[in-house]
Amino acid sequence: LCFDCKKYFQLLKPDYFYNNVKTEKAVLVGVHRKDDKENRLKDYLDELEALTTTAGAKTMARLTQNLEYPDPRTFIGEGKLNELETLVKVHEADLVIFDDELSPSQIRNIERVIKEVKILDRSMLILDIFSKNAKTAQAKTQVELAQNQYMLPRLTKMWTHLSKQKGGIGMKGPGETEIETDRRVIRSNITKLKERLELIEKQNTVQRQNRSDKKRVALVGYTNVGKSTIMNLLSNADLLAENKLFATLDSTVRKVVLEDQRYEGVHVPILLSDTVGFIRKLPTLLIESFKSTLAEVVEADALLHVIDVSNSDFENQMMLVKQTLFEIGAKDKPTLLVFNKVDQYMAQHPDTVLTEFEKSWLSKEHAPVVFVSATEKINITGFKQKIVELLNK
C-alpha cells in the first residue's frame, strides 16, 4: 500500500476513535421529529450515552432540537450548531456524537464550524464497538467488511479527519489520484472479505447439518436484555454476560437438556444458540455483514425472544426485534416471549398483579409468554417447561 493509504487503514483499527491515554469526553446530539412521542428523544439519548460509555468515552452534555426534518447541510440548524460549538469548548470535548447517520457532506459542513474535535455519527460509534468486541475470525471479518463498506463513500471526508488527528497523522489530504488508488484498494478488500465470509459460512452450514438431529432454539432480542445470562443459566456455561451493549457478537451454541415436567423421566435435548443483540438504527451494512451469524436464527426450530421488561422502552424494543426478524426471514418461527428482569419491573410497579399482566400480553401477542428473572432465578422451572411445550407444538 502507498504511505497515505496505510494511514487511512488506521481507521479500521479498534482504537481509532478512542485511545488508551485518557477517557475522551463527548457531547451527544439528537433531533426530536414531529412524529416522535414526547419522551422518546430522552430514551434515544439514554441509549446513545450507553453506547458511548461502552465505547470508552464519557458523556459531558447533550444537545437536542425539535425539527420537522434534519437540515440537509448540517443536520441541526445554524443556531444549534453555534450552541454546539460553545458546548464543545465549555466541556473541552474530544467527540461530538450524533444519534443518526450523517452524510459525508454533513460531516464536512459541521467540521467547518466545530473544529479540532472528531465528529461521529451513530453508525460509526456502533461499528467501533463491534470492532472492539469481535473475538472470532467470523465476527472480525464481518465487522471489517461493514467498516470498509461504510468508509468507501466517505473516503474524502475521512482524510479530513486524519489531517486533524493529534500525533501528526497526515498534515494534509492526498490528491485525487491517491484517493482513487485507495478506493480501488478498499473495493478489492471488500471483495476478499466477502469471499472469506462465504468460505466461513460454508463451514458453518456443514456444522449445522451435522447437528440436525437435535431441535435448535435461538435466543434473540434487543441488546443487553439478558440473553447471555439466560444462556448461562440454561446451559450451565460461563459465557460473557456483562451489563454492556453488544457484549456478545458471535453466535455461541450449547447443548441443553430440558426435563418435561409432565412426564417423569422424559428429557428433551436441544441446541441453544446465543446471538448478537439488535438495536435501533443498527447500520444496514452490519445487518448484511452479520447475516451469516444470524443464520442460526433463520434455521432454528424455535425462538426465545428475550425482553427487558424493566426498560421503559421495552415495547418499542420488541417491535424493532420483530421488524429485524421479518427482514432476515425469521418472523414466522414458533416464538416464546421471555419477559426478563421481572424482579426489577415489580420493584418499579409494586401494584402490578403479575398473572393479570401475563394474561394481557398473552392476548396482545397471541404467543406464549413467560416472566422470569435470570439473575434472581425466578420462575426458571416454568420457563424451561414453556420451552419444551413450544417445541412439542
Model-derived segments and their meaning:
Residues 44-53, 85-90, 100-117, 259-268, ...:
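Conserved C-terminal guanine-recognition region of P-loop GTPase G domains, centered on the G4
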Residues 32-36, 67-69, 101-104, 124-127, ...:
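Conserved nucleotide-binding/hydrolysis micro-motifs of P-loop NTPases
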Residues 35-40, 70-74, 133-137, 178, ...:
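Flexible beta-alpha connector loops of hexameric P-loop NTPases
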Residues 115-167, 331-336, 343-393:
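Canonical P-loop GTPase G-domain recognition
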Residues 1-126:
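N-terminal accessory targeting/assembly segments
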Residues 28-32, 62-65, 97-99, 304-308, ...:
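Conserved beta-strand segments of the P-loop GTPase G domain that flank and frequently precede/overlap
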Residues 20-23, 161-287, 294, 298:
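Conserved G1/Walker A P-loop phosphate-binding module
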Residues 48, 96, 148, 186, ...:
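Residue-level signature of catalytic and energy-coupling elements of molecular machines
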